């Protein structure tokens, strides 16, 4: 069989383009320009109002309410700039052996701002890109509101706080492990930001939980626009308390609804199994709240049709449906019309009623005269009632007159607060992933395309995914690097339907086709805020029939039905836009950002009063003493059991940045002096700490080794450590790694502390952790020139340092989740121009199927390779490679291409 010919037609790949702007903020590379903001952040005060009544009372609340909520507005730094379309176009170009010209243009306009304005932070507007931010949501939301001017700009907040108040709390510790067991010690979180949240939030159980949640609701409220909504997803353990808390924050008058929805699987309980979770819905200003009703399909056998118990046969006979007919309407004769009876009278509140009033008059049906009962009146005028009678919409029921409402008058029914259709299989990538349909409905009810959506609890990025699908802008926040690693991969590889834009030539044409009306003559601009071209459903109402000018006496039934159809109202189905199946859409440009250095609130002086009152953190001295004791016992381990740095002596050191000093013996009996620096208890080790500790060690008493211990290291940590090494080793005569790791003048060892240390001695005993201090590996990369002057990068694994010999050895690529290349690194920001996912999953499977006619298997396989596709020598002379492991740890390496 001859091979199938490839189509020459290129499938358009699109993204949603937002005309909105965002304020320019610093990148990690340009952080030195905002040192003042980092060192002395402005403190924002959120006033307390203890006079609110009724309100919850919990342990420590009086002390919390005695002071305003104080939160520092710290800078947020851009770590990566990602344009998924550029990655896909690169794959397509590789398959066709074309030059990926589109990629350069896509990144060229990422900022839309000149350099001198780029470093004048917070003063200029640049192109919108969606945002994924690592850090404490309280700090991030405060910074967004106060430093970046987003106060009153967010249309919807979706918050999914932890459900319970127990130890396990279902934190996912790796991108590879989703079978997390609640209250199981080995599944405890392995990330300092989340440990901080665990200790602060759960130390006093529900008391701390409520303090934690109230602060974040207060800051979220400040971000909401007056028409905005806040949704909180919660389980049955705390729904009653959280509703009271939201009454206190938003005001009881701002309560909209409590939505109950079915979970995919029931939660085991001692008595009844729990199959339902809840969504609490509050508006910022209930009188101005944006609301777009959603509808579900009505059917006699299914939902929405239960009240339709009568049938009108083609011969005009009307009767009640039999049980068999209700179960299967297909057995009815063709032309039968199912209906229900409705009221044709209304209350006359504040208006004249009874005999003599405008709506009190006799109506004759089938020779019998009827009057409205009691103080009620007819729902329409005499002419209107005559129209209803001519249309066969009035029927006598004893002494009452009723309105005939056909099943097909409105083939849908409005969504209420009981969502029993949300259970079902989902492709989970995160242990506590929120049901996509739940977020989708919340978003569609309260936002329009182009509106801004915020999720302070990112998880696997479901809110961002849904917002992207429906053309909303999004910001998502999480303390978990694992969560953001999963979310980033999910969004980079996502494929979405291409919906017709109302403000586009194709959209105008589609709308004319659907409505049967001539398209208006106007210039389109592709503005997403004008929405999509939506499906509509006819809605025949009593009012539309009563006021129909075309219904006349003597008309046939078909003529009357046509007149009713012409003047029927329509309802917009906001969840059913028309789709162009010939095009595909991918995620638009977004940035990965973090507080610096992945900052969390740590000291009592810096933490909000609520968290201080809920749980007093142990002193820094106590933490350092515990680390010293464990360092003495455990030493520093690499991935090989026998290779451990054992301290002969280790004691406190009275330095500014150095905490301990001691000695160890290398193989061969050579004694060496070592200095130890301990990173923050609840944060990430950044380049500033490494630099200052190294300077102090060099100026000191001749240390042979510096060990920097931290729970997490930012991506630039290795680059900083390498500045204190010997002369850079050349990978070739043309390529020099900036700061290629050398253990010369002052070897710096980055040791990742087991996060169980942050949980305290009690948990440490419970988990039985063995390797408490592990050497932080550096990726083993090979950059080489290939034919046509192009360059490739190969990742061989992670370099492991043997503390007993001082030698470096490479391990496999198994621990690497993904790696990115900026093939033209300018030193100002990291653009993800190449992306490779070496984990077990294949995230691009859906896009692969959509583009199977254009891109062959070999080109797609490049996305999962440990060797990059060839690329041109960079204009700027540098490339940067970022490697991310399954725990979300990142390392960045920069190469000078000479």
Model-assigned labels for residue ranges:
Residues 297-409:
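N-terminal auxiliary segments of SAM/dcSAM-dependent transferases
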């Amino acid at each position: 069989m001859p091979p199938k010919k490839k189509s020459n037609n290129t499938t358009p790949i699109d993204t949603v383009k937002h005309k909105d702007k965002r304020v320019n903020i610093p990148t990690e590379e340009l952080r030195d320009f905002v040192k003042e903001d980092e060192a002395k952040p402005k403190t924002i005060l959120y006033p307390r109002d203890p006079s609110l009544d009724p309100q919850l009372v919990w342990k420590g609340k009086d002390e919390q309410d005695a002071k305003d909520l104080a939160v520092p507005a710290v800078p947020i730094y851009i770590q990566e700039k990602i344009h998924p379309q550029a990655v896909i176009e690169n794959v397509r170009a590789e398959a066709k052996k074309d030059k990926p010209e589109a990629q350069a243009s896509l990144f060229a306009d990422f900022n839309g701002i000149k350099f001198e304005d780029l470093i004048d932070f917070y003063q200029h507007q640049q192109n919108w890109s969606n945002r994924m931010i690592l850090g404490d949501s309280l700090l991030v939301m405060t910074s967004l509101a106060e430093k970046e001017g987003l106060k009153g700009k967010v249309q919807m907040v979706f918050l999914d706080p932890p459900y319970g108040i127990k130890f396990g709390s279902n934190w996912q510790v790796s991108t590879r492990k989703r079978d997390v067991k609640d209250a199981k010690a080995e599944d405890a979180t392995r990330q300092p930001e989340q440990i901080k949240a665990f200790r602060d939030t759960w130390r006093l159980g529900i008391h701390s939980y409520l303090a934690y949640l109230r602060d974040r609701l207060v800051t979220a409220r400040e971000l909401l626009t007056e028409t905005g909504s806040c949704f909180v997803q919660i389980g049955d353990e705390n729904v009653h308390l959280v509703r009271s808390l939201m009454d206190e924050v938003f005001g009881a008058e701002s309560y909209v609804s409590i939505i109950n929805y079915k979970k995919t699987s029931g939660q085991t309980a001692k008595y009844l199994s729990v199959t339902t979770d809840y969504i609490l819905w509050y508006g910022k200003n209930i009188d101005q709240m944006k609301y777009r009703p959603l509808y579900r399909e009505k059917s006699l056998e299914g939902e929405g049709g239960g009240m339709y118990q009568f049938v009108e046969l083609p011969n005009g006979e009307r009767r009640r449906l039999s049980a068999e007919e209700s179960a299967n309407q297909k057995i009815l004769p063709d032309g039968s019309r199912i209906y229900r009876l409705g009221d044709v009278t209304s209350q006359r509140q504040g208006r004249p009623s009874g005999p003599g009033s405008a709506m009190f008059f006799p109506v004759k049906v089938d020779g019998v005269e009827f009057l409205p009962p009691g103080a009620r009146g007819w729902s329409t005028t005499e002419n209107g009632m005559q129209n209803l009678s001519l249309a066969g919409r009035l029927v006598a029921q004893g002494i009452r007159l009723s309105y005939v409402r056909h099943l097909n008058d409105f083939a849908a029914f409005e969504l209420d607060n009981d969502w029993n259709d949300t259970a079902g299989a989902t492709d989970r990538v995160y242990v506590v992933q929120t049901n996509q349909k739940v977020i989708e409905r919340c978003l569609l009810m309260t936002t329009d395309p182009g509106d801004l959506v915020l999720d302070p609890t990112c998880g696997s990025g479901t809110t961002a995914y849904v917002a992207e699908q429906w053309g909303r802008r999004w910001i998502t926040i999480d303390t978990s690097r694992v969560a953001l690693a999963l979310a980033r991969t999910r969004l980079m590889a996502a494929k979405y339907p291409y919906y017709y834009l109302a403000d586009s030539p194709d959209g105008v044409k589609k709308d004319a086709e659907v409505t049967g009306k001539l398209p208006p003559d106007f210039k389109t601009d592709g503005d997403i805020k004008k929405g999509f071209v939506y499906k509509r459903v006819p809605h025949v109402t009593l009012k539309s029939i009563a006021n129909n000018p075309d219904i006349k006496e003597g008309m046939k039934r078909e003529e009357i039905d046509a007149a009713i159809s012409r003047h029927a109202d329509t309802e917009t189905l906001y969840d059913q836009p028309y789709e162009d199946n010939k095009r595909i859409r991918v995620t638009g440009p977004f940035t990965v950002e973090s507080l610096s250095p992945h900052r969390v609130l740590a000291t009592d002086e810096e933490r909000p009063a609520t968290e201080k009152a809920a749980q007093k953190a142990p002193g820094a001295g106590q933490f350092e003493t515990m680390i010293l004791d464990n360092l003495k016992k455990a030493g520093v381990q690499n991935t090989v059991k026998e290779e451990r740095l054992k301290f002969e002596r280790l004691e406190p050191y009275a330095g500014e940045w150095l905490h301990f000093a001691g000695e160890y013996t290398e193989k061969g009996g050579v004694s060496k002096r070592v200095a130890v620096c301990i990173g923050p208890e609840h944060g990430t080790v950044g380049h500033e700490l490494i630099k200052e500790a190294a300077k102090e060690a060099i100026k000191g008493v001749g240390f042979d080794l510096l060990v920097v211990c931290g729970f997490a290291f930012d991506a630039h940590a290795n680059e900083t450590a390498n500045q204190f090494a010997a002369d850079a080793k050349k990978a070739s005569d043309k390529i020099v790694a900036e700061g290629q790791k050398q253990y010369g003048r002052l070897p710096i060892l980055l040791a990742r502390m087991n996060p169980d240390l942050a949980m305290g001695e009690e948990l440490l005993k419970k988990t039985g952790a063995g390797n408490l201090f592990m050497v932080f590996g550096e990726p083993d990369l090979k950059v080489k020139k290939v034919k046509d002057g192009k360059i490739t990068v190969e990742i061989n694994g992670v370099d492991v340092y043997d503390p007993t010999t001082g030698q470096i050895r490479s391990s496999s690529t198994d621990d690497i989740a993904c790696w990115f290349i900026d093939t033209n690194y300018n030193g100002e920001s990291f653009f993800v121009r190449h992306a490779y996912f070496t984990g077990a999953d294949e995230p691009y499977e859906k896009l692969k199927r959509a583009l199977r006619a254009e891109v062959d298997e070999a080109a797609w396989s490049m996305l999962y390779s440990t060797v990059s596709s060839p690329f041109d020598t960079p204009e700027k002379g540098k490339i940067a490679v970022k490697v991310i492991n399954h725990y979300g740890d990142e390392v960045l390496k920069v190469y000078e291409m000479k």
